[in-house]
Amino acid sequence: MPQPYGETSRGFRFLALGSALAAWALVAVGGVVRVTGSGLGCPHWPLCTAKAIPLDQKASFIEYSHRAVVALLIVLVVAVAVWAWRSYRSRPDVLWPALAAVVLVPLQAVLGAVAVWLKLPGWVVAFHFVVGMLFLGTIVYTAAAAWRRAERPATPGFTRLAWGTVLVGFALISVGATVVALDADAACGEQWPACNGGFSVGGGHADVQVAHRMLAYTVAGLALALLVFALRARGPRLAGSLPILAVLIQMTFGILIVVVGGEGRTHEILQGLHVGGAGTVWAALVALAALSGDPRAERAARPLTVTPAVAG
């Protein structure tokens, strides 16, 4: 039965949190699939091969582990959406992202299948990754909104800054996926912060790599601003510190990928950490934006006070 605007139940909060953790795990396992070249470890879909699941092969095991996490996540996401529909239709900040996650499930599944059928073309893989991040964002937002206390909203300025950072963060993810699609990881050689001896761009893949770096610096600056605002008690303090920490760790992985270079084991590990780090940064930004609250929802939640007229 739908409940009035207010805090969600403990069971729902933990179910939503479990879904968010599973969604992050999916991104991390997807990174392992990419850096180990296991994307075609299962050449058929949804089964691994035409008749069986050959888990004795490393690539097949890694790829099918990715699909197993997907299956678990679908169950969790549908459960969250059904619960939200039945009990929290008065909480649009919980209901709509939960339903959006369900809508994104078939799109993401189709993209994954197409990627396998077409032998992993770069642009399909990149689009698959971007949609996967949108999927992660909707689930994380649902979980964070479910845990948010209605009586402790952040200031409107903090909320706007948080959402602005989310938008720039999504641009960073999209350009990063483009770097992968174009195989432009080494477009700047092993140079950082410079690119091919300078900072100017001269066309080609270097442009995309430089754009990716500039967006990363911008997100870092915005995350630092969020931390300053949060420490001044204008936003969630603990959550406000997470984005800058995640961004700094992620930038370290990115710099090491460039400096180390090569195609060795260390390079592969760093690439995997960079993909997982991207999911962590994105989740931290979305969670902070959700926890900062929606002033419109807060106003709607307050009871209307009517002052009786004084007879003259």
Each language-model region and where it sits:
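Polytopic transmembrane helical bundles with strong interfacial aromatic enrichment
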Residues: 1-312
